[in-house]
């Protein structure tokens, strides 16, 4: 199951990128996936995303994402939702571009008041693009960044269990129950 990480933070070497890489590692371990992944860090493409015609770098990023079986999409929480940079990139994708993919939403946030943004905003975007989103998104508080290895495990286990139905040899892509779209976000730190 090839894994592609999409990071929608407008800053290079962001905390969002660090969290996404750690989350991808945790999912890879928990699900027993082959090591290796591609990362699309949108801050590198930012100046190209609003051009009328996509640059070769943007086309390559789109190709990586649309060819992926598993897409981990990470964004900081900005103004209560995912970044505009992430939205601009996904607006470039054709309708139903993620029809064959399983997506995992993740957001990094300053405070618990935004914990629901991952499933209230990012999950519907991924579902609109056709992705299966069978596991709860992860809302990571900045205050928990120092203990990522300890807190990613339970969530990665949930994701791994959800991915079992999508492994090669399983009888087709299952229909997602309504609960898969309404699952509460897994959140690190204090209760909401």
Positions of PLM-derived features:
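N-terminal beta1-alpha1-beta2 submodule of the flavodoxin-like/Rossmannoid cofactor-binding fold
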Residues: 1-91, 175-192
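Hydrophobic alpha-helical membrane-association signature
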Residues: 19-23, 118, 155
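A short helix->loop->beta-strand "cap" motif at the edges of active sites that frequently abuts
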Residues: 34, 98-102, 131
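Structured loop/turn residues at beta-strand edges in well-structured enzyme cores
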Residues: 66, 96-98
């Amino acid at each position: 199951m090839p894994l592609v990480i999409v990071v929608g933070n407008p800053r290079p070497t962001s905390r969002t990128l660090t969290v996404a890489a750690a989350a991808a590692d945790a999912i890879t371990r928990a699900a027993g996936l082959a090591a290796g992944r591609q990362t699309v860090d949108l801050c590198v493409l930012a100046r190209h995303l609003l051009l009328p015609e996509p640059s070769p770098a943007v086309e390559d990023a789109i190709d990586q994402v649309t060819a992926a079986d598993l897409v981990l999409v990470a964004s900081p929480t900005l103004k209560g939702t995912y970044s505009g940079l992430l939205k601009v990139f996904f607006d470039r994708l054709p309708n139903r571009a993620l029809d064959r993919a399983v997506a995992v939403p993740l957001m990094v946030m300053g405070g618990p008041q935004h914990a629901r943004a991952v499933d209230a905003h990012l999950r519907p975007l991924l579902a609109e693009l056709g992705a299966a989103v069978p596991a709860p998104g992860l809302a990571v508080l900045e205050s928990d960044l120092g203990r990522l290895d300890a807190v990613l495990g339970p969530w990665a286990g949930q994701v791994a269990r959800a991915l079992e139905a999508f492994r090669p040899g399983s009888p087709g892509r299952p229909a997602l129950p309504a609960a898969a779209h309404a699952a509460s976000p897994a959140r690190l730190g204090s209760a909401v």
